[in-house]
């Protein structure tokens, strides 16, 4: 009792669930109090009208009802206040329980003769409501139910045990009462256990759904950052839609296209300035760096450039080795795009100048800028990189190549847009770049107004750095200085976004303390500022689970019927399996068994009743056998084959809604029928019939005089009130089928209400009159009270149980549907989350190789440091289509070059499709540079792995690259056939050590660096159309693998001097494999 009135809730598994459970039970509690108040209001005029009495004739009943009306109205007011209810749930529940007990004992000891069967139904109502409608835990509810039962038995046993006239039939009646209370406790506990299980399941589904939503939100943020790190927003949305379509269709490759062309995501923009910048002297410096130093240096340098680009409204396009190029005026047009690029170029030169002065390392910056129009977008299927194409882009590239270190080199078009913002001087380009010399247009060098001041300030620092440089490598000195710039690391945002992803992330307990109302209109000021978005969403979830929501407009449910608004969802709900049906049937059998025991205790057990019960028992055993037949699987398998189908009956019941509804309805009707069996088979005495006809016409006054002495002993009238109690148990049997539809429960309850009231108020009302005549046959007895007459008492309790169970049925229906809805939402969200995760992985693998992506995603993310990896043997391929430069033109016919890029997109996309073939799984696409395709093999090997294996095995992937190059030529031949062109492939191969890494926080980019890469690029640029040119070392490695190579001789290679190169003995213009010796 002390625990029940404690203001603090008992410790529970989950404080979140306690808050949710408290809210879910508020509605049944309010309904219980409302039913009691309404019954008190209706009882007075209804009873007076039904019995033909005046209210003043029964002052005890009138007083008790008025006290109940006042007391429970006060409790209703307290329970309707949400904040107080959450804080004082247990004390208020205890107070209601005590008030119900007091009301029950008030009815028991007022209004006439006290009998053993008196107010048993009301105490049964108390017991059931303690379990089903009061917000108590199972232990508290069980304690209250047992105390209510024992108190009634002990009080009546002690009170009636001293009365000689009551002792003869007292023991069977008390035993019948005990069976009734035991059944009520079991049914109540069973109902509560089912509801709590359903509530907890719904809560867990909702909580899982919340975590899924947060995870989904995180994945969406990942995608947003990943896409925007590769593409502009307008292009990201368009391409994301296509990827989602692929993933939802279960296809990793592109969907079938009716026009046989790959999707082209390229648009033309005018009024754009393009900046190319190259770090002069970096190649020599990089050769002295360790892999970690090289990647750190590049990331810091290009991170600084990205920062400068952002300040001047420029967008970096791509990083090509140590070359950086960007544009201004994309994707939105900017009037000052030329000024933006010039300012950025000057700031880049200043940054490198400061670096040179501070470290003493001889590096410089060469910048070229041109203004015009571009085609911008993405081509290919893999390793997307936003790029720009046009003659103006080519000119900007040559402006950088023909520029002066430390200066910004601009064209006349850019100069015209500067409008005198900067002073310039004429540039001498005759001896620098053939393209510019052939163009014949004048170019200019921008004069930096702050260059002289910075040079003077940096002289002292430069001398100091030069002294330190004598004891420190230039690369190390450079690295240490660049670390002070603090450039962001690639994909650093992923770690910040991952905090809410884990489903085990707890939410703050303060957000769910009972004194905090979940009504957002009452949320304390400043609370929203303290809670993060996830917590606010959890408040919304709790509110959505509130049982009061069933009476409010919902986008998922129909307000009146609770049907799902989506017909397909309603169909799925009704067809869903119900494995727990067998337990519903088993508990209903307990109610049936209780009715049987009660009737055997209080009736004369006529043969017809025994025969009927025997048949009903057989039907029930058959029903239970069908429901639990799956537990006989092992036994049946050992028996004859003709019995192997028996376990399928249980599955049939669980999965077939029609069969299940039929069995459930039949079970309840059996309980209904047998509840009144004793009444139907009650023997009739002519004396009792005579009495009944006279009693009904007697006018009841304060002193009731009976017409003579009548033999009533032969009639077992004591079974009349117990038949009424059995009818009440029949009502309770409907509550056991938790997943039975509300409309069916309504129909069965209404049917049983009409049948019960018809029996007790009409066809068999005379039996109640006989019992009253028996109890009040002495002239000294006062008139019986309203709740002392079985027929009136039964009708009142029938209506009370009818409305109570109807409300519970609607609540059960709401939670069953809500549980189904949350499970469906959770499945959808998990599928969507899985799709989003796959999309994130696909996007990340579109930026990074598959073996590098796990470094930045998943639970073992290691992006605290820059990713870098050195390899001893990597084969690098450069494959270009030089003829495309001549093919490309800009005219109205080809939409200013757009149709030319459409063909290039087909070429690159067909090349990309080769990567999905298993034989080329080891080939990694690095990037495309115009019409040049760069790829590498050997990057999926771990560092140092090559040195631990023999040379032949370590370079075996060179053969894969050769096969890939031949496949590229075959693909190009097919495109030539369909496009009526004669493009030819020029390929350069080289193998050796490289450094791989990821650089750039704004647009992370995976790249490889080293002499091997530079020489491979030279092998392509100095190669011959239709041939694969390789270095001498690579030729020897290929010959060891069985390929035939022949010498081309010595050629002059920029930056390398004279090199002896070889051609692979194959023709890329024909489909086939290279010849092998």
From Swiss-Prot:
The keyword Ion transport does not apply. Residues 503-524 are annotated as: Disordered. It is an enzyme of class 4 (lyase). Disulfide bonds: none annotated. Binds 2 magnesium ions per subunit. Is also active with manganese (in vitro). It catalyses: ATP = 3',5'-cyclic AMP + diphosphate. Keywords: ATP-binding, cAMP biosynthesis, Cell membrane, Cytoplasm, Glycoprotein, Lyase, Magnesium, Membrane, Metal-binding, Nucleotide-binding, Phosphoprotein, Repeat, Transmembrane, Transmembrane helix. ATP binds at residues 278-283, 320-322, 366, 927, 1007-1009, 1014-1018, 1054. The modification Phosphothreonine is found at residue 533. Mg(2+) 2 binds at residues 278-279, 322. Belongs to the adenylyl cyclase class-4/guanylyl cyclase family. This is Adenylate cyclase type 4. It comes from Mus musculus (Mouse). The gene is Adcy4.
